From Swiss-Prot:
Gene coding for it: moaA
Name listed for the protein in its UniProt record: GTP 3',8-cyclase
Oligomer and partners: Monomer and homodimer.
Species, as recorded: Cyanothece sp. (strain PCC 7425 / ATCC 29141)
NCBIfam families: moaA
Top enzyme category: lyase
Matching InterPro entries: Aldolase_TIM, Elp3/MiaA/NifB-like_rSAM, MoaA, MoaA_NifB_PqqE_Fe-S-bd_CS, MoaA_twitch, MoCo_biosynth_MoaA/MoaC, rSAM
CDD domains: Radical_SAM, Twitch_MoaA
Amino acid sequence: MNQVDYLRISLVDRCNFRCQYCMPEQAKLEFLAQSEVLTGDEILTLVRDVFLPLGFTRFRLTGGEPLVRPDVVEIVGKIAALPQVQDLSMTTNAYLLTELAEDLYAAGLRRINISLDSLIPAVFDQIVGTQGRTRWQQVWEGIQAAYRVGFDPLKLNVVVIPGVNDQEVPDLAALSLDRHWHIRFIEFMPIGNAHLFHHKGWIPSEELRQRIRDRWGLTEGYVRGNGPADVFQIPGAKGTLGFISQMSECFCDRCNRVRLSADGWLRPCLLNETGQIDLKTGLRDNVPIEELRERVRQLLLLKPEINYKGRDSGTAGAEYHRTMSQIGG
């Protein structure tokens, strides 16, 4: 088991998209009231006084969509200023990134992952939900803005949905040819989208690699980061390709992260709804910080047993009742 030193912090459960795999339009969601969401100061307290003393050095801000939170730049600046923080990154849909990229970079953010599930605007809108207007062009402009500002590495996340965008995999891989972009293909997961998952299933990463291999060739590669991706490269390309195979190639033994939801629940495993602890209530009830730190330490000791290992079938096993946006992907 790897040392657990990586915390993913969900800043908000809301999003300006309704992606099929994260916040399906069919899902009847009850969003958190503002009073239920961790404040910026509470997040800073947990990072500084609970997680850093336990050996956490790497942090990623997620959602929902983190950029819809008004104080996102301030939160980035406060965490980035902590001397023990070795790496601070963010996952975003980039819809608001054009106007925020420079401020985020100036605040100390250096790495960013952007969701880009299709190069075809109509398919992209089918996946993310239009809410009355197309979204692709503004996302593409946000990606370009992040590239100009200097985020490095700049990673593009592609959730591969059979029959929807899987035919685009070679074209998406080609984005790595002429730019230092890192394209990551993620197997479709059964998180709050059972109606889609049972119908469509998932495509193993090895099959995706073979499609790229047939068109471009493929060699092993490397890119800086904290994730479980297996990294490859098209020969001669400036960027790389990553494959996150949580369904077909279990990587529980390599897991180095825990997740903090927007309402303060610490979750040791994305695919297991047991073993969570409520840190927000402890903070607001003035539980001594040493006690909160000990609760987290004890949870980390249990993490190897909590990690979900039943990925033999996409339709077998537990039902996942919370959406990815509620968990904090």
